[in-house]
Regions:
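Short, structured coil segments at secondary-structure junctions
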Residues: 12-13
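Acceptor/aglycone-binding surface of glycosyltransferases and processive sugar-polymer synthases
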Residues: 19-34, 39-42, 51-131, 157-175
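Catalytic donor-sugar/metal-binding loop of nucleotide-sugar-dependent glycosyltransferases
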Residues: 104-105, 126-129, 138-156
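Hydrophobic packing residues within well-ordered alpha-helices of enzyme cores
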Residues: 5-9, 57
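A conserved acidic beta->alpha catalytic loop
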Residues: 1-6, 47
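Hydrophobic residues within well-ordered alpha-helices
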Residues: 9, 61, 141-143
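Terminal low-complexity segments of carbohydrate-biosynthetic enzymes
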Residues: 173-193
């Protein structure tokens, strides 16, 4: 599918960036590292994100001086056509753990529809190469005392591609990452990100 993606976008005015390693988190890290603009946005190519929400997100960053804006499928007047019962329950549990362990005030920890200040994202020293990136990013952002907010978002049914998340395998990786970060920054007391 990588070749199909490259073929589909090669006629557009965009840079194609190749990963050094493999994995969802590695792709997002590599993307953030190469951004040269003031703001960046993680935006899935499967058609599930609503581009109409981008203007609202950028206005939150510029006018309200937030460092990051997280979209959420679990605010009022929003939802998802792509969520399953298992992913909904898993996300609820991980979001709850984010609140308990780190006082993280977002309602959809696994939804990586995020816009933010590039300079702030580059300070986070992100390391996850897999789907645990979804929790590492907001947790390190919170631990770094950056200013953030959530907005309501509606996730549409994907237009193309297959869901690559394995709810149980990736759920275990995500839980392991949360425990690791909790032990490192809250129990052992390493304050440096």
């Amino acid at each position: 599918s990588d070749e199909l993606t490259i073929e589909a976008i090669k006629n557009y005015d965009c840079n194609i960036i190749y990963q050094d390693s493999r994995g969802y988190g590695d792709a997002l890290k590599k993307g953030i590292e190469t951004v040269e603009t003031e703001f960046f946005c993680i935006f899935n190519a499967d058609g599930s994100f609503d581009p109409k929400e981008l203007n609202f997100m950028i206005n939150k960053l510029k006018n309200d001086k937030y460092d990051f804006v997280f979209a959420s499928r679990y605010e009022k007047n929003c939802g998802s056509d792509d969520d399953t019962f298992v992913t909904f329950i898993g996300n609820y549990i991980f979001t709850y753990l984010g609140k308990i362990f780190f006082n993280l005030k977002i309602s959809d920890i696994l939804y990586t529809y995020v816009m933010g200040r590039t300079s702030c994202a580059k300070k986070l020293e992100l390391a996850s190469k897999d789907f645990s990136f979804c929790v590492e990013f907001p947790i390190k952002m919170k631990l770094s005392r950056m200013k953030y907010t959530s907005i309501a978002s509606y996730e549409k049914k994907r237009l193309g591609g297959k869901k690559k998340v394995n709810a149980f395998k990736d759920g275990f990786l995500i839980l392991s990452e949360m425990i690791k970060l909790f032990l490192r920054y809250k129990i052992i007391g390493n304050s440096k990100i």
